């Protein structure tokens, strides 16, 4: 893996960090992230790296209401199952929510709601891969790496 370049910047939902290399965006982190990114100590602060700059601009545009989707090359690292779940998150339309059961059905594993939930919780690209749009079966907001107030704000 090549060196990841990153920037941390203020946003309407708090500080965000974006890390990318030439292959795509690898991580988006909230200041209060539950899980730290692997290898973060080796990242180089470079806010002018092309994909870091583009991701920052698109995220801020989205968070200010000027965008509903993203056009970024993504490079998440995970298990084959996690990657399938994360790709499926991109199918949840803006302004809609899915339950974990709906996400499991869309992944093709209708009995795997808990495994889908675990993969959702490890999403390295929140907001862009909209894990915040996944809610409990009864419509309640459930865990989110950026915190439930942030999840509510994103919805």
Language model: regions and residue ranges:
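Short glycine/serine-rich loop segments
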Residues: 109-155
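Basic nucleic-acid-binding alpha-helical/helix-turn surface characteristic of O6-alkylguanine DNA
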Residues: 1-111
């Amino acid at each position: 893996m090549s060196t990841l370049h990153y920037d941390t910047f203020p946003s309407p939902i708090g500080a965000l960090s974006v890390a990318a290399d030439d292959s795509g965006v690898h991580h988006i982190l909230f200041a209060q992230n539950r899980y730290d990114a692997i290898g973060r100590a080796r990242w180089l602060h470079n806010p002018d790296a092309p994909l870091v700059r583009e991701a920052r601009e698109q995220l801020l545009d989205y968070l200010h209401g000027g965008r509903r989707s993203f056009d970024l090359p993504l490079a998440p690292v995970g298990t084959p199952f996690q990657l399938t779940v994360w790709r499926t998150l991109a199918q949840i339309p803006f302004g809609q929510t899915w339950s974990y059961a709906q996400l499991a059905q869309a992944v093709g594993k209708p009995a795997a709601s808990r495994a889908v939930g675990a993969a959702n919780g490890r999403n390295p690209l929140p907001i862009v891969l909209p894990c915040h749009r996944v809610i409990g079966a009864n419509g309640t907001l459930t865990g989110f790496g950026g915190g439930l107030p942030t999840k509510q704000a994103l919805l």
